Regions:
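Beta-strand-enriched cores of mature, soluble protein domains
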Residues: 1-150
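N-terminal polybasic/positive-inside topogenic patches
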Residues: 155-157
């Protein structure tokens, strides 16, 4: 398998909320805003509903988002993954990304499974905590797609 870069998304979480759960887990909700650059270029907006194991534990991103492409197209995306909590200032994230688009040239992504790798960076400057007490940092996510298309085995004729 060979991968090729598809785009890079840089985003921030201007708002967030969190609920503490039994066993030290946390359920969080983040609003994401940013920019997508690469084969798809445009505005990025989304929501992340990750679950995190303790203050310094791993986390599971669960994103739904939209890219408003500069050419007017709308590309919806779904991203699931796993994040390592170390090192704290550059937490690492990997995952799978699925897209939905209703026009060319993006429609080809509808039956492609993309992989992503990225990092969550600690803010370079002091930022005020949001209403939940969390510091809102910056994330950098690169998505890659396989050169060959992948079709779901469960798709019925």
């Amino acid at each position: 398998m060979r991968l090729e870069p598809l785009y890079r998304i840089r985003f921030t979480y201007p708002e967030s909320w969190a609920v503490s759960l039994d066993g030290g887990w946390q359920q969080m909700f983040f609003i994401a805003e940013g920019r997508c650059e690469g084969a798809i270029t445009g505005r990025f907006r989304g929501a992340n509903f990750p679950r995190k194991e303790g203050a310094a534990g791993p986390f599971r991103p669960d994103f739904r988002a939209v890219i408003e492409a500069d050419d007017g197209a709308t590309i919806m995306m779904e991203w699931h993954g796993y994040g390592r909590a170390c090192p704290p200032e550059r937490r690492q994230v990997v995952g799978s990304v699925f897209h939905l688009a209703d026009r060319e040239p993006y429609r080809r992504l509808n039956d492609v499974v993309c992989v992503c790798a990225g990092e969550v960076r600690a803010p370079a400057i002091q930022v005020r905590p949001d209403r939940s007490g969390h510091r809102c940092g910056r994330a950098d996510l690169g998505a890659h797609r396989r050169l060959t298309r992948w079709r779901a085995a469960s798709r019925l004729p």
